[in-house]
Amino acid sequence: MLIFATMINDVDDRAFMQEVYQQNERLMYAIALKYASNTQDCEDIVHDTVERLCKNIIKIKGLPNSALRAYVVYAVRNTAINFRKHQATINRHIQQLSDDD
């Protein structure tokens, strides 16, 4: 995922995040698919999750492997929930605009 190259300057941190992504990619997509209505939304959720993980790299580097996996699961789930809430808000605004016409 190219996001590592743009968000993380440190080579070791970038390698760590790449490993986290590779080890958890299928899991992240599986969780995101439970909340997404299409493939593009699923990819957006995973991308947003990876971005959040990169921002918290100092915190997650200190986690043991089992805790790291749980952290990733919760991060994807929370990102997906926030994504759905945001989509619902957008749809509500669109509906209000169309009702005003």
Give residue spans per PLM region.
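Arg/Lys-rich amphipathic alpha helix in sigma70-family domain 2
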Residues: 59, 73-95
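Structural recognition of an alpha-helix C-terminal capping motif at a helix-to-coil junction
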Residues: 30, 44-51, 55, 66-78
